[in-house]
């Protein structure tokens, strides 16, 4: 819904074998606000507030699971989940989330300013968080002047940040699953001016370009696009265009890889949705399956290899077509290697990022251990050892940050509203601001 009027719990779900898995949470939605549900949690049961019993949904079709989860506003849904932090499927917990509408203002673009100080010099880094590419099509069709849209909001926020004399801008597209293609084009022209934003190839092989040759650029200063694995579709179009035009840095992880266009046709007894075309960057590469690779990689608190279009059975492959004409802003130059070096130096000094690296290495080791003992006592001992290792890694970081440690693994896994939560996403944003400050210092002075 481009108008961002959603009802339910605000979670994107997918089918993962027998399980319904949480792919991502809608910014500002009931699930995110509850702090009880996370990406990669598996939903194994659903119940209603007045029911004592939880319905087992293992092996169910995803649309049937969604039907159980949805319900009237202000009612409670119970979810039995296997937490993403759990080592196996034997540990579950039941959470309650109150269904609600996702308010437009919760999903609208927001601004902030981060201050980065280097050798006595302060860099004011503007941040615009954009959770979705939204547009009120009804108001647009009525030709209302001030209809709600992401591009209009971002323009206003940029002008406001300019008045506050920012030195550079971060456009935060993390967890932005896309939305209006029209808005992706409009936003691209804010940073690129006129030109092609994306190419579209139909099933019959014809290719056409989307963009605006007369687009008006309103921001021409240092720019960084922040993405993660849940940045998809329109987010990938915008990030890919900025990267191809060499207008700014793209920082984060590989994106989702959703580069196809679907169409819904009405049938006599229902509807059918089918893929009719694919997106291609101006440089010729498809965003399908592969996504957009950042100029500088940042660590991720989740296993990014287990998420994305490439994990779907029968997903269309990545391919290339001929590149189209586009302007080279040449804003990056040879600075990327220096910026990467400075970034890696900071990583070695950060408790949070060192801990993320250690946890990733530990999980890789766990995944590579394919031997399972048939002796029940040995299996229990191995499980307890793994739980203690993960708990030790978590508590090690909490001690370094001066936070209370968890007494046992059960307390760690079942935590819900931790008042001393370690905000990894905020640490990633702060490091992005440091990268942009480096970019300004070495490229724009």
Feature map (PLM): residue ranges:
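Acidic, polar loop-rich interaction surfaces within structured domains
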Residues: 229-232, 240, 247-250, 254-323, ...
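Conserved functional hotspot residues or short segments at active or partner-binding sites
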Residues: 287-444
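Short, compositionally biased low-complexity segments
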Residues: 36-44, 162, 401-413
């Amino acid at each position: 819904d481009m108008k961002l009027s959603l009802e339910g719990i605000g979670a994107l779900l997918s089918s993962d074998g027998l399980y319904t898995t949480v792919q991502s949470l809608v910014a500002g939605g009931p699930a995110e606000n509850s702090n009880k549900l996370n990406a990669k949690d598996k939903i194994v049961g659903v119940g209603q507030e007045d029911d004592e019993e939880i319905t087992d949904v293992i092996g169910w079709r995803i649309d049937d699971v969604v039907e159980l989860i949805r319900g009237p506003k202000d009612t409670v849904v119970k979810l039995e989940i296997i937490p993403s932090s759990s080592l196996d499927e034997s540990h579950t917990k039941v959470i309650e989330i109150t269904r609600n509408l996702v308010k437009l203002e919760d999903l609208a673009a927001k601004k902030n300013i981060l201050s980065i100080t280097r050798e006595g010099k302060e860099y004011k880094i503007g941040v615009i968080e954009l959770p979705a590419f939204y547009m009120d099509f009804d108001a647009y069709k009525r030709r209302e002047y001030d209809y709600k849209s992401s591009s209009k909001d971002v323009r206003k926020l940029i002008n406001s940040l300019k008045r506050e004399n920012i030195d550079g801008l971060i456009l935060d597209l993390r967890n932005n699953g896309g939305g209006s293609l029209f808005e992706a084009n409009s936003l691209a022209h804010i940073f690129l001016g006129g030109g092609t934003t994306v190419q579209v190839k139909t099933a019959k092989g014809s290719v056409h370009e989307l963009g605006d040759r007369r687009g008006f650029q309103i921001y021409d200063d240092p720019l960084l696009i922040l993405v993660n694995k849940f940045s998809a579709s329109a987010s990938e179009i915008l990030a890919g265009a900025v990267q191809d035009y060499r207008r700014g840095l793209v920082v984060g992880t590989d994106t989702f890889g959703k580069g196809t266009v679907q169409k819904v046709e009405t049938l006599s007894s229902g509807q059918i949705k089918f893929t009719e075309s694919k997106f291609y960057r101006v440089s010729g590469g498809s965003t399908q399956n592969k996504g957009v690779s950042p100029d500088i990689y940042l660590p991720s608190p989740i296993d990014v290899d287990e998420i994305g279009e490439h994990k779907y059975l029968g997903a269309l492959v990545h391919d290339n077509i001929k590149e189209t004409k586009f302007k080279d802003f040449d804003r990056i130059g040879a600075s990327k290697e220096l910026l990467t070096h400075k970034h890696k130096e900071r990583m070695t000094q950060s408790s949070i990022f060192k801990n993320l690296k250690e946890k990733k290495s530990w999980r890789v080791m766990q995944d590579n251990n394919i031997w399972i003992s048939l002796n029940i006592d040995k299996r229990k001992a191995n499980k307890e050892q793994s739980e203690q290792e993960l708990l030790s890694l978590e508590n090690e970081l909490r001690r370094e940050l001066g936070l209370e440690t968890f007494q046992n693994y059960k307390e760690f896994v079942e935590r819900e509203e931790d008042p001393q939560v370690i905000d990894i996403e905020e640490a990633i944003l702060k490091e992005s601001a440091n990268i942009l400050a480096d970019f300004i210092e070495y490229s724009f002075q």
